[in-house]
Amino acid sequence: MRLVANTKSAKKRILIIRKRTMRNKAIRSAVKTAIKKFEMALKVKPAEEARELLRQAVRALDKAVTKGVIHKNTASRKKSRLTRKFNSVYKAS
C-alpha cells in the first residue's frame, strides 16, 4: 500500500480514515439492506413479518446513529417515513 503523505502523523491519519471508511460503509450497507428487506416485505409478507422487519430497520438506523455514521435527524426522518409506509399499507386493509 502506497501512501502519498509525507509525515508520520499524516500516514497514520490515512490509515485511520481508511479503517473508519470501511466500518462506516459496512454500517450504511446494513441499514440499506434492512430498509430494502422491509420495503419488499410490505409488498408480499403478512403484517407481523413486516412489523418485525420494520423493527429491525429502526434498530439498524439507531445503531448507525449511536456509532456516528448518520445524523440523528436523518435517522428520525427515515424511521418516520418507514412507519408511515407501514401504516398506509396495513391500516388501510
From Swiss-Prot:
Positions with biased composition (Basic residues): 74-84
Keywords from the named record: Ribonucleoprotein, Ribosomal protein, RNA-binding, rRNA-binding
Stored InterPro entries: Ribosomal_bS20, Ribosomal_bS20_sf
Segments crossing the lipid bilayer: none
Record has Ribonucleoprotein as a keyword: yes
Pfam families from the UniProt entry: Ribosomal_S20p
Gene Ontology molecular-function annotations: small ribosomal subunit rRNA binding; structural constituent of ribosome
Described function: Binds directly to 16S ribosomal RNA.
Protein name stated in the entry: Small ribosomal subunit protein bS20
Lineage of the species this protein comes from: Bacteria, Bacillati, Bacillota, Clostridia, Thermoanaerobacterales
